[in-house]
Amino acid sequence: MKPVSQLLSAAIALTPLTAAADFMGLYLGAGSWQSAPAGGIGRTDIDLESTLNLEEESNGFAYMAIEHPLPLLPNLRLQHSEMNWTGSALITAGTDLNGNPFTTSQQADISLDLTHTDATFYYELLDNISDLDLGVTARLFDGEASLVGSTQQETIELEAVVPMLYGKLGVAVPTTGLVAELS
């Protein structure tokens, strides 16, 4: 009987007294990045860079993520991104943003707002020195594009929900609290 009690005592002594696992996590963040619009918009495919003279601007974002231990329910990340550009350009006759072509060439103020909010539902597949998250995102655009000339004005409302896949890979540097992420 003595060997059994010694074995049991050794097993208890080697067992950690606490187990560490994430119970709930709340993550908040904000940032800014330089972005430039590219491509065309409107019925006559107006070039955002060469025709409208929209240039690189600093735009901000903020996010919140909630993680929990329930395996069947996905985690949630909400992110709001402000994306606005303004400029001024000579608009030629026939330029058509939204079905009402400009009748004369004129100087116009341009604004492009691609502000959007992301709702991401994801599962945390790895959560140790490396993190792997996979899920889906619904991106809700709520913006507009407008051309305001001396005699005419046109506006397009830009409202749409865009479904996307979501993935995040992170690697932690042990004992430093630093993490490199790619999403």
Where are these regions (language model features)?
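Transmembrane beta-strands of outer-membrane beta-barrel pores
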Residues: 30-36, 80-86, 125, 138-144, ...
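Short glycine/proline- and aromatic-enriched beta-strand/turn motifs that initiate or cap beta-hairpins
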Residues: 21-84
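Transmembrane beta-strand segments that form the barrel wall of outer-membrane beta-barrel proteins
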Residues: 176-183
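Flexible, solvent-exposed loop segments that connect beta-strands
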Residues: 38-52, 86-112, 142-157
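Outer-membrane beta-barrel strand-turn architecture
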Residues: 68-72, 125-129, 171-175
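Cleavable N-terminal export/targeting peptides
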Residues: 1-24
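Residues that define the transmembrane beta-barrel architecture of outer-membrane proteins
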Residues: 22-24, 44, 56-60, 113-117, ...
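Residues on the lipid-exposed face of transmembrane beta-strands in outer-membrane beta-barrel proteins
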Residues: 28, 62-68, 119-123, 136-138, ...
